[in-house]
């Protein structure tokens, strides 16, 4: 007898003995497809964020050489200003990351949008899982699963296929894998994600410390991404290798139907091709009109942010979660001191140790005024040890000394009731402009209530020493509720305005205008 008829007869006998009567309901198939689509968006946008600071640590000080893993060969010199975090950024192809081309602002926006829908899809999936009793497919109910899973692992290791009788609907090893992904890996990603928010960490310092710190949580988030990526590759591979006719007809039609195997193959492979093409198309759609993409993507995240991070502000001054021993020996910076070509005025002031510097404070106030550094120090002084969080991923802890913006604004009379924002302008210049026009002075805008927070100061000192040029001398804004791109350096003026849409490109600051970040930097 030839081998082919024998194999066919054997398969038929097995099928008769182990009839496949499992049903994959529509809700299961739909949520799986949505999860597949969104996980690709999350991983690709996550890669874009990683490329902005391709180093991972377990300590919040982020000292060069303390990385446990890095995706760059660059060595970081310890001299102040010799190497910046911006120098570390990588420009990736849109085929790999979302959107690619070093557009971290848009990558972060995509990550936020995808996270919102992924969470919603997950809640729906778990609700159906519990409500229909399908949880027993994933949740082990006996310790017998462990030796059975070991037997399955040995079977796969010997490149053999487990019997169809072992799948109810999954074999023990696959059941453990699904249980781990759904009930351990997914919650890990959910609980570590908020630690990336300066508003959350500033309001609840204990939450970050629960994971060992913000950087430890960031590293756990990366490990979770690797777990998901590895699981997806193995999972899709096994679908096509182990009892593929059963798997594919279940995925497409909900039950095993030998007469529709070919149709199932075409549908599944075609769907994968379309989804991969869609992932790549998202990148090029985003890059085709970056301003349009910025508006649409960030607007899409506002709803969930209003319910979550927008409710929090930093209370590091009151809670004092950091002490002198936590201060970073090395603190990353993102830009360099303005050159003479960029700002001759700044260089002249710096040459005289800012003795002639005066901070202009005006706009929608009744008594505009200007102040020297000595006059500012005479008004009030506050020191705070806080953690700086950069949207690239790195952190640094330092002691900042300066005047609360609230105390400063109290010196310039009444604030117009229509004033809702505070604009801070810098001696520094933007790296580039959105439309390619000549670069303009760097600026940022804060909502008035955030500018009046206890943790918001204009700092003239760092770690009990005068502020250096690299860190923003003569004055540097510290707004601990926000990411670092709002903490403008080399501040020359403070202006009360009606709304941020009336200045610059109308997006809320230089990083928003040309870097496509959001004016709300709480996450």
Predicted regions and their residues:
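Short, well-ordered loop/turn elements at secondary-structure boundaries
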Residues: 35-37, 184-185, 223, 354-355, ...
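Membrane-embedded alpha-helical bundles that constitute the cytochrome b-like, heme-associated redox core
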Residues: 1-311, 523
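A glycine-rich, hydrophobic loop/mini-helix early in the fold
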Residues: 348-400
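Short acidic (Asp/Glu) patches
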Residues: 99-104, 372-374, 406
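His-enriched metal-coordination microenvironments in redox/metal-binding proteins
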Residues: 111, 174-184, 221, 353, ...
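Extracellular-facing segments of soluble proteins and assemblies that are Gly/Ser/Thr-biased and enriched
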Residues: 109, 116-141, 155-158, 387-429
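Extended, aromatic/histidine-rich regions of cofactor-dependent oxidoreductases associated
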Residues: 2-19, 243-352, 359, 411-523
């Amino acid at each position: 007898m030839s081998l082919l008829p024998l194999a066919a007869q054997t398969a038929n006998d097995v099928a008769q003995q182990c009839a496949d009567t499992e049903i994959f309901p529509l809700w299961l198939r739909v949520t799986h497809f949505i999860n597949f689509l969104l996980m690709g968006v999350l991983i690709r946008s996550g890669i874009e964020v990683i490329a902005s600071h391709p180093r991972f640590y377990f300590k919040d000080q982020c000292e060069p050489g303390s990385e446990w893993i890095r995706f760059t060969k660059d060595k970081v010199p310890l001299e102040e200003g010799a190497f910046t975090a911006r120098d570390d950024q990588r420009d990736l192809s849109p085929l790999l990351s979302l959107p690619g081309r070093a557009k971290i602002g848009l990558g972060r926006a995509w990550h936020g949008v995808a996270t919102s829908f992924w969470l919603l899809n997950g809640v729906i999936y778990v609700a159906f899982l519990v409500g229909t009793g399908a949880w027993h497919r994933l949740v082990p109910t006996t310790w017998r699963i462990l030796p059975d899973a070991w037997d399955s692992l040995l079977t796969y290791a010997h490149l053999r296929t487990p019997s169809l009788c072992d799948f109810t609907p999954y074999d023990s090893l696959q059941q453990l894998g699904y249980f781990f992904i759904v009930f351990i890996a997914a919650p890990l990603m959910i609980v570590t994600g908020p630690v990336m928010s300066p508003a959350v960490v500033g309001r609840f310092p204990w939450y970050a410390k629960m994971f060992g710190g913000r950087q430890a949580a960031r590293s756990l988030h990366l490990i979770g991404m690797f777990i998901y990526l590895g699981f997806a590759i193995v999972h899709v591979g096994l679908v096509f290798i182990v009892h593929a006719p059963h798997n594919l007809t279940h995925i497409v039609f909900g039950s095993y139907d030998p007469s529709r195997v070919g149709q199932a193959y075409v549908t599944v492979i075609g769907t994968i091709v379309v989804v991969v093409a869609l992932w790549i198309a998202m990148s090029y759609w985003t890059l085709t009109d970056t301003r349009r993409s910025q508006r649409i993507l960030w607007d899409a995240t506002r709803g969930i942010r209003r319910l979550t991070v927008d409710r929090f502000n930093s209370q590091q001054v009151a809670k004092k979660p950091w002490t002198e021993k936590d201060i970073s020996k090395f603190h990353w910076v993102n830009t360099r001191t303005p050159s003479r070509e960029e700002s001759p005025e700044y260089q002249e002031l710096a040459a005289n140790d800012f003795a002639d510097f005066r901070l202009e404070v005006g706009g929608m106030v009744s008594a505009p005024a200007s102040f020297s550094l000595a006059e500012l120090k005479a008004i009030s002084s506050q020191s705070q040890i806080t953690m700086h969080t950069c949207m690239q991923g790195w952190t640094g802890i330092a002691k900042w000394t300066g005047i609360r913006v609230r105390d400063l604004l109290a010196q310039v009379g009444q604030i117009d009731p229509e004033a809702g924002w505070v604009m801070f302008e810098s001696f520094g210049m933007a790296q580039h402009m959105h439309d390619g026009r000549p670069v303009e002075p760097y600026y940022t805008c804060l909502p008035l209530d955030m500018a009046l927070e206890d943790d918001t100061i204009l700092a003239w000192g760092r770690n009990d020493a005068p502020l250096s040029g690299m860190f923003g001398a003569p004055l540097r804004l510290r707004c601990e509720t926000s990411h670092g791109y709002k903490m403008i350096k080399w501040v020359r003026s403070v202006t009360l305005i009606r709304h941020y849409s009336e200045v610059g490109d109308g997006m809320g600051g230089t990083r928003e205008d040309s870097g496509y970040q959001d004016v709300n930097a709480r996450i």
